[in-house]
């Protein structure tokens, strides 16, 4: 009887864990309002809301050198709309240029922000992942793919010659174009497992996201 009860409990846990997985549509609906548009002096990128106080995770290269930062929250709009009514001033709180991570904050955040959770679970190779961002001004666009590899202490540079960045990253098939940088890589629960960082110009299926392992360390560091 003990073993049967134990088996029944395990089956219940399995069913609950399976039912908590969201469809692609559900992941987008859960997470899209937790993704922001970040405007700097020289360009734009994506970010992920992680606190009710308006803290946002993004890439360092999205906010690098920007003296003026503004953040737009998700809204229903046409391309002809005046974006200014949706923008909030933001400031940089901390950065880690080596990991290409930044934490910024909306100075006067509105209420009821949709905060995204950061997962502490390392996703296995082959896991389906999701991304929301603003590739080439296609605002709040959704893409999906799979984790191909986890690369510890991966080195990369945005300029020819030299290595500027080192971090544990996920290699995924999820497309990352200009404007996607800084947005969240999400698991099937809609939780953050990485920050989308850059894609290969030579191969569309080689795209890289700084892992949540690095994000958690970054947030914990003083």
Regions found by a protein language model. Give the residues of each.
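Bacterial N-terminal signal peptides that target proteins for export
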Residues: 1-9
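Conserved active-site neighborhood of the chymotrypsin/trypsin-like protease fold
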Residues: 34-35, 43-44, 51-140
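Active-site region of chymotrypsin-like
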Residues: 29-42, 106-115, 141-222
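N-terminal signal peptide c-region/cleavage motif recognized by signal peptidases
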Residues: 17-19
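Cleaved targeting-peptide boundary
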Residues: 21-28
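Short, well-ordered amphipathic alpha-helices
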Residues: 23, 70-75, 146-151
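Small-residue-enriched segments and motifs
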Residues: 47, 88-90, 145, 183
